[in-house]
């Protein structure tokens, strides 16, 4: 454990089998530590230090580590996988989402397959400006997150709540959101609508829902 201490501390108590091996540990060492109650098995090839503070969305962190199990957190770049879509919204604590799957973007040309039924891999191009570090994870920016959700025709009510929360918390500028949302207005049944009008439509719906709920 002494050889893994700095690594697990930097990764919120998590470590992959490959990272441990590169640090000088062996698979049998990890098995012994699990049997001794020192480590907990989180996911295939991912362990957590028992008793360590359990950070928010630990399962999401474990799934992200699986995307490039040989790399430590500070060695990862956009090409190795980024938290995205509904999972990114969870990281920003916007909307009222309870997704059944963890979502990531892995830009081409890299290919990655997973057997996990609770993980969805999207293939899309990303620039350095599309991502940021959030609590030790590479995550799509709030603006890019909205674009990704809208491109999948994410439920309008939920998208509106995500956008409204971002505006309320100053996570995104309304002008930038208007420009980003403009190409998707027609897909949401509002052809000929400007991005600003679409944004107002989404946020007005949330205001109406809140008002109705308050009068019930």
Where are these regions (language model features)?
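Short gly/ser-rich loop at a beta-strand->alpha-helix junction or flexible surface loop bordering the NTP-binding
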Residues: 1-148, 152-216
């Amino acid at each position: 454990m002494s050889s893994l201490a700095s690594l697990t501390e930097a990764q919120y108590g998590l470590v992959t089998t490959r990272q441990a091996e590169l640090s000088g540990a062996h698979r049998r060492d990890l098995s012994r530590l699990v049997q001794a109650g020192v480590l907990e098995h989180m996911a295939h090839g991912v362990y957590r230090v028992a008793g360590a503070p359990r950070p928010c969305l630990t399962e999401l962190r474990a799934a992200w580590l699986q995307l490039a199990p040989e790399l430590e957190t500070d060695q990862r770049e956009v090409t190795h996988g980024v938290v995205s879509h509904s999972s990114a919204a969870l990281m920003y604590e916007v909307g009222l989402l309870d997704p059944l799957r963890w979502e990531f973007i892995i830009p081409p040309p890299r290919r990655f397959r997973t057997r996990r039924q609770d993980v969805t891999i999207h293939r899309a191009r990303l620039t350095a400006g599309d991502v940021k570090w959030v609590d030790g994870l590479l995550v799509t920016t709030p603006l890019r997150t909205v674009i990704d959700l809208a491109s999948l025709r994410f439920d309008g009510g939920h998208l509106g709540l995500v956008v409204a929360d971002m505006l309320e918390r100053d996570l995104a500028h309304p002008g930038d959101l208007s420009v980003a949302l403009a190409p998707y207005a027609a897909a949401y049944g509002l052809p000929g609508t400007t991005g600003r009008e679409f944004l107002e439509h989404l946020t007005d719906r949330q205001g109406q829902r809140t008002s109705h709920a308050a009068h019930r």
